[in-house]
From Swiss-Prot:
InterPro entries named among the record's database cross-references: E6, E6_sf
Purpose: Plays a major role in the induction and maintenance of cellular transformation. E6 associates with host UBE3A/E6-AP ubiquitin-protein ligase and modulates its activity. Protects host keratinocytes from apoptosis by mediating the degradation of host BAK1. May also inhibit host immune response.
Any one GO biological process: symbiont-mediated perturbation of host apoptosis
unnamed zinc finger segments: 42-78, 115-151
Localization terms from the record: Host cytoplasm; Host nucleus
GO cellular component labels: host cell cytoplasm; host cell nucleus
GO MF annotation, one: zinc ion binding
Protein's name according to its UniProt entry: Protein E6
One Pfam entry name: E6
Keyword check for Zinc: yes
Recorded family membership: Belongs to the papillomaviridae E6 protein family.
Domain of life (superkingdom): Viruses
Length: 156
């Protein structure tokens, strides 16, 4: 499961790990390499991430996990499986986006929202679309989730 200390987290695990790169971009800068040259294994299935997996992980604003073997990411397939497992195990509530201010006192546009399918951090234009179409949003493990454009159109 995504947590504050592992793959898919939204922030550094602890103050003791501040010297380690948290993102793929930071790792590339630290190692003075580019995307096509970086090699990371998936934290869950141990396969080497493809260039597309690395790009998707970075664009999703997910953080690297550090272990004895170095940093790991998460491949696209495992990301989707993890998102489904989290929905099943940690789902708290769902509601229409327009009801959110009545429910929690905040608008969707004021919240950090991740994709329910691929865990990507939603951009403001995606949140605006969810609000305009009054789509469902879900609170899963304390994090609000909606569906990103890539998943809406079937690209991910």
């Amino acid at each position: 499961m995504a947590s504050t200390s592992g793959v898919g987290s939204v922030g550094p695990a602890s103050c003791c790990e501040t010297q380690k790169p948290h993102t793929i971009r930071e790792l590339c800068l630290a190692q003075q390499i580019t995307y096509p040259c970086i090699q990371l294994c998936c934290h869950y299935c141990y396969k080497i991430l493809s260039v597309l997996d690395i790009y998707a992980f970075d664009q999703s604003c997910l953080y690297l996990s550090w272990g004895e073997g170095g940093p790991t990411g998460i491949c696209s397939q495992c990301t989707r499986v993890l998102a489904r497992l989290e929905f099943t195990a940690r789902h708290e509530v769902s509601c229409a986006a327009s009801r959110l201010p009545h429910f929690i006192g905040q608008s969707l546009s004021d919240l950090e929202v991740r994709c329910v399918r691929c865990l990507a951090l939603l951009q403001s234009v995606e949140k605006d679309y969810i609000l305009r179409e009054d789509l469902s949003v879900h609170r899963i493990g304390g994090i609000w989730r909606g569906t990103c454009v890539r998943c809406m159109v079937g690209l991910y």
